[in-house]
Amino acid sequence: MNKHASLIHPTAVIAPSATLAPDVQIGAFTLIGNDVQIDTGTIIGSHCTIHGPTRIGRNNRFIGQAAIGGEPQDKKFAGERTELLIGDNNTIREFVTINRGTGGGGGVTSIGNDNWILAYTHIAHDCHVGHHCVFSNNASLAGHVTVGDWVIFSGFSGAHQFCRIGRYAFIGMGTLINGDVPPFTLIGSDTLGRPRGINNEGLKRRNFTPERITAIKRAYRTLYVAGLPLAEAKQQLAEQAKDNDDIKELLQFIETAQRPLLR
């Protein structure tokens, strides 16, 4: 038995067209389907299924029982070639499901680097997840959701299709998101998805200076507390954004919203 074969449990099934780096480990009763590529350092636990076309990067850990790269749960899907792209250094826990894209939605579902995707999370077709995100147990994304870097989804939270979640946002436990969530925003733990302030603790953990946090708080008050019509709030944010990249990011997010902004 060669060295690579010794890293693959004898009960695992590897399709002929799957491509595995020499040090990839495959656990018991796992199925790796056709057109799957897995890069170096990745560990696939027991009872996982990975269907292609799927590309998985370096140093990922699939703990077990995950269903990855399955067909999209979309009645419009007609078997067209679509794919799932997963980056590096992600941890994907038990019973996670991540589906491939659809032809009508761009054809790709993508997961970035350094994400923690915890048990029973579902990431649907055509979603795009950035880097350093956390999806706590039972979080769910409907199709076509875009999630920026450093976002945290608490347990049992979810996002409606086509929503965007801006960078550094925090989604509270059990919250259902049905609109775009601006960067830096904290959404309260209720089913209505109401903004409760900025993600102050998260920004501190990411080494935002007090000055940056103060400016973001001012922008939040302009958008949510002052009672201004959105058009007027955007005018004031444009003034605040002249010398502030964080507020520029916030304003650009608002101006490119595809769904109603959570307010």
From Swiss-Prot:
Function comment: Involved in the biosynthesis of lipid A, a phosphorylated glycolipid that anchors the lipopolysaccharide to the outer membrane of the cell.
Transmembrane annotation, as ranges: none
Domain of life: Bacteria
InterPro entries from the UniProt entry: Acetyltransf_C, Acetyltransf_C_sf, Hexapep, Lipid_A_LpxA, Trimer_LpxA-like_sf
Broadest EC class assigned to this enzyme: transferase
Name this protein carries in UniProt: Acyl-[acyl-carrier-protein]--UDP-N-acetylglucosamine O-acyltransferase
Assembly, per entry: Homotrimer.
Catalytic activity: a (3R)-hydroxyacyl-[ACP] + UDP-N-acetyl-alpha-D-glucosamine = a UDP-3-O-[(3R)-3-hydroxyacyl]-N-acetyl-alpha-D-glucosamine + holo-[ACP]
Gene Ontology molecular functions: acyl-[acyl-carrier-protein]-UDP-N-acetylglucosamine O-acyltransferase activity
Localisation per UniProt entry: Cytoplasm
GO terms under cellular component: cytoplasm; membrane
Keyword set, alphabetical order: Acyltransferase, Cytoplasm, Lipid A biosynthesis, Lipid biosynthesis, Lipid metabolism, Repeat, Transferase
NCBIfam families from the UniProt entry: lipid_A_lpxA (TIGR01852), PRK05289.1 (NF003657)
Known EC number: 2.3.1.129
GO BP field: lipid A biosynthetic process
Pathway as given in its UniProt record: Glycolipid biosynthesis; lipid IV(A) biosynthesis; lipid IV(A) from (3R)-3-hydroxytetradecanoyl-[acyl-carrier-protein] and UDP-N-acetyl-alpha-D-glucosamine: step 1/6
Family listed: Belongs to the transferase hexapeptide repeat family. LpxA subfamily.
